[in-house]
């Protein structure tokens, strides 16, 4: 299925039904009192989070949603039937924005969570409502109110615990294939990952975390170059970033130190908050160099960039070091509350 993470839709709630103007007409009662009933309420429109959906692609085909109006009231004090509400399923992690004002209406992060995006119009009142001691035969009624109408911008931000960062061909997709059941495309050319992939990494039967692999970043990504910038927003909900560094690049001109610095610059320009997030270095493709060269090369990179946070050496292809890394990630996630990041902002 094609991955779509933004959509524009129009929602129009139903209008309320009108109140009825009616008087009792029965045998031997020529001047019966008012018996006009109220109208029904118009249907409202809700978004509902569905864990079985992972893209907004369906809105490419249907982008206008309209609820029915309530029925008008009838004589004999019969109330018009209210219209049924409409529930539009969206993926977990969907934000709903008012397109014209830019107002955030809500963020759907829990299965079954609902968000009212267009309220149905209130019903009109029948003339029976206006009977009083001084007005025995009121001819007054009210009309139903119109329903709300909005243009919404839906934006999907994937829900993941861990985000994978790095230049194209740093080995992120190979890693996520190694430690999870996800199957992103892997090849020896840039941009084999064209959209985000989620992988569930299971430590044991009771412990797991979700990792997000996004397309690799390149110099100038924050200004729109390459593919990764469009998907950086999917890392905003993560609690840990794993920065993958190719310690044995195919091109000798590609310096691992320059690669690390380039990624940090792009993160800082895109979002200072994202750049300040907890981040670990993962030196990948260590199977391509000798043990002695591996140690010296990794130490040189750490020294050059003055890195003081955790560092891991792995080979995503052979699996060397991967179990140690994912167990450390699991331990970190268990120690850090999911709400700690939100509280600090």
UniProtKB/Swiss-Prot annotation:
The keyword Nucleotide-binding applies. Keywords: Cytoplasm, GTP-binding, Hydrolase, Magnesium, Metal-binding, Nucleotide-binding. GO terms for cellular component: cytoplasm. Pfam families: GTP1_OBG, MMR_HSR1. Mg(2+) binds at residues 173, 193. Its main location: cytoplasm. Its cofactor is Mg(2+). Residues 127-148 are annotated as: Disordered. It is an enzyme of class 3 (hydrolase). It is found in: Cytoplasm. GTP binds at residues 166-173, 191-195, 213-216, 284-287, 315-317. Coiled coil: none annotated. Residues 160-334 form the OBG-type G domain. GO terms for biological process: ribosome biogenesis. GO terms for molecular function: GTP binding; GTPase activity; magnesium ion binding. The keyword Transmembrane helix does not apply. This is GTPase Obg. It comes from Nitrosococcus oceani (strain ATCC 19707 / BCRC 17464 / JCM 30415 / NCIMB 11848 / C-107). The gene is obg.
């Amino acid at each position: 299925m094609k991955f779509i993470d933004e959509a524009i839709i129009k929602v129009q709630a139903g209008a309320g039904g009108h109140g009825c103007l009616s008087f009792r007409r029965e045998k031997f009662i020529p001047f019966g009192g008012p018996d006009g009933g109220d109208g029904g309420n118009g249907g409202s429109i809700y978004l509902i989070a569905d864990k079985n959906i992972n893209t907004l692609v369906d809105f490419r085909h249907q982008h206008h949603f309209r609820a029915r109006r309530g029925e008008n009231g009838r004589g004999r004090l019969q109330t018009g039937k209210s219209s049924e509400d409409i529930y539009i399923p969206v993926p977990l992690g969907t934000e709903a924005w008012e397109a014209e004002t830019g107002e955030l209406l809500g963020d759907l992060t829990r299965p079954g969570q609902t968000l009212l995006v267009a309220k149905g119009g209130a019903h009109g009142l029948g003339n029976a409502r206006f009977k009083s001691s001084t007005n025995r035969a009121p001819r007054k009624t009210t009309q139903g109110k119109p329903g709300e109408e909005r243009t919404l911008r839906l934006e999907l931000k994937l829900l993941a615990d861990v985000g994978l960062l790095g230049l194209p061909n740093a080995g992120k997709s190979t890693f996520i294939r190694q430690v999870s059941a996800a199957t992103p495309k892997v090849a020896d050319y840039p941009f084999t990952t064209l959209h985000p992939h989620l992988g569930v990494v299971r430590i044991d039967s009771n412990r797991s975390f979700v990792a997000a692999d996004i397309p690799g970043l390149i110099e100038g990504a924050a200004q729109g170059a390459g593919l990764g910038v469009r998907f950086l927003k999917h890392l905003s909900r993560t609690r840990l970033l794993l920065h993958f560094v190719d310690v044995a690049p195919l091109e000798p001109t590609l310096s691992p130190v320059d690669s690390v610095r380039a990624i940090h610059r792009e993160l800082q320009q895109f979002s200072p908050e994202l750049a300040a997030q907890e981040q670990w270095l993962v030196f990948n493709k260590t199977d391509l160099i000798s043990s002695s060269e591996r140690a010296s090369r990794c130490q040189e990179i750490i020294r050059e960039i003055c890195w003081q946070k955790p560092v891991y050496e792995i080979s995503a292809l052979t699996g060397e070091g991967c179990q140690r890394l994912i167990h450390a990630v699991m331990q970190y996630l268990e120690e850090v509350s999911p709400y700690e990041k939100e509280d600090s902002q």
